[in-house]
C-alpha cells in the first residue's frame, strides 16, 4: 500500500516538492508553480474535501489570492501545476508565493520566492 497508509493516522498529507519556474521574470510574463504531495485517506471514501489557496505577496502584502474551496484530495502521489501571469505593471523586486493545501484535520503550507526584473 502507498506510503504505508494503513499504519498512519488518517488523513495523512506530506509535501514532497515545490518549485517556481522561472525564478526571475519580466513584468507581463508568467511563472509556473508546481506542488507535489502525497495523501492517504480512509478507504471508506474515494476522496475528502480540501482547500487549495495560493497567494502572491510583495513586501508582505497580498497582491493576488486564488482559492479552490472544493479541492478533492485522494490517496496517492499528486502534482498540481499553477500558471500565474505577472501583470505588465508589476513592481520589480522579490515576491513570495504562499501555497496552502488543507483539510479539516491537516494542513500543508509552502513558501517560495521569485523575482520580477525589468
PLM region descriptions:
Residues 88-92:
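Surface-exposed, short loops/turns at beta-strand junctions within beta-sandwich domains
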Residues 2-84, 94-102, 107-108:
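Contiguous segments within soluble domain cores/interaction surfaces
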Amino acid at each position: 500500500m502507498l506510503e504505508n497508509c494503513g499504519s498512519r493516522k488518517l488523513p495523512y498529507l506530506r509535501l514532497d516538492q515545490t518549485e517556481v519556474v522561472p525564478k526571475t521574470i519580466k513584468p507581463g510574463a508568467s511563472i509556473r508553480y508546481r506542488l507535489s504531495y502525497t495523501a492517504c485517506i480512509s478507504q471508506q471514501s474515494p476522496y475528502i474535501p480540501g482547500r487549495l489557496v495560493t497567494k502572491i505577496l510583495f513586501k508582505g502584502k497580498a497582491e493576488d489570492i486564488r482559492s479552490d474551496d472544493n479541492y478533492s484530495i485522494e490517496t496517492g502521489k499528486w502534482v498540481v501545476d499553477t500558471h500565474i501571469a505577472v501583470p505588465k505593471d508589476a513592481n520589480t523586486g522579490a515576491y513570495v508565493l504562499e501555497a496552502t493545501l488543507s483539510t479539516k484535520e491537516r494542513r500543508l503550507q509552502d513558501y517560495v520566492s521569485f523575482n520580477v526584473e525589468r
